[in-house]
Design a protein with these regions (language model features):
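Eukaryotic low-complexity, mixed-charge intrinsically disordered interaction/regulatory segments enriched
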Residues: 1-57
Length: 57
């Protein structure tokens, strides 16, 4: 999966919340609470963090 393949609104949401300082686990949990499968949530967040130049830990 590539960051660009994510829905535009999801990419925007991820960027916005990373800029606000939310960490990996908080973002993953939010996506899971919204109904996204665990693997997809982790991959999407990791891609967004990598794009933002943030650590994945």
């Amino acid at each position: 999966m590539q960051f660009e393949s994510l829905a535009v609104d999801l990419r925007h949401w991820l960027r916005e919340n990373i800029e606000r300082g939310f960490g990996r686990e908080a973002l993953v949990q939010s996506l899971r609470a919204a109904g996204h499968p665990p693997k997809f949530a982790r991959q999407a967040v990791d891609l967004a963090l990598a794009r933002a130049g943030r650590r994945l830990a």
